[in-house]
Amino acid sequence: METRKYTKTRRAEQQDETRARIVEATVTLHETLGPAQTSISAIAAAAGVQRLTVYRHFPDDASLFEACTTRYLELHPPPQRVAWADIEHPSERSYAALLAFYQYYRQTESMWRAAYRDLDQVAALQVPMDRFEAYLDEVADDLGLAWRTTQAARRLLKLTLRHALRFTTWQSLKNAKLKDRQIAELVQSWLEGVES
């Protein structure tokens, strides 16, 4: 009986290890080639398994992308609100949040660039990307509430923050040769302009 229990335990461990290798291979290929250019054959080769093994663990693109996104965000978690929650002045709080996201984007640029580039081509990307965008909107709305201003100005502040927190906004300003602090300062001036 002990041998059978050991065999089942070892088999489960091997399946977990295989699954982890497939996920790691997917993360690496999505970051280097992009989701649209990553084939199941390439994932299988990088993970050292057969294509059928990939399908056994991940029967559809949605489950594979969910596992890939979960793993990537475990390794590279986006900035969390607790990092700037104690900053009282709304302009300084917004600046701290923006700078945190811009530094995060710089460190993780290759993955976000590939994901946004391939978003329209890969349906399975939509759910994880929508979830990330929803998180950005929550952060923007939370930052906007800290500003003591009129309702109309607050609406514009939130819209500005939502736009400013997007990877694509950071990317366009980075491509214009601005550093992260310069981008955060520029956006801070937009916010202060809306408030006045």
Residue ranges and their predicted role:
Residues 57-58, 67, 186:
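Residues in the recognition helix of alpha-helical DNA-binding motifs
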Residues 142, 158-179, 192-196:
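Amphipathic C-terminal alpha-helical segment
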Residues 40, 69-77:
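Short, basic, alpha-helical segments at the C-terminal edge of helix-turn-helix-like DNA-binding modules
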Residues 30, 65-72, 119, 128:
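Alpha-helical DNA-contacting segments of helix-turn-helix folds
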Residues 99, 103-116, 121-159, 184-192:
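Amphipathic alpha-helical packing segments from all-alpha helical-bundle domains
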Residues 58, 117-121, 164:
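Short helix-capping/turn signature of helix-turn-helix
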Residues 1-33, 37-52, 57, 63:
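Basic, helix-initiating cap at the start of DNA-binding domains
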Residues 67, 78-107:
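Hydrophobic alpha-helical connector segments
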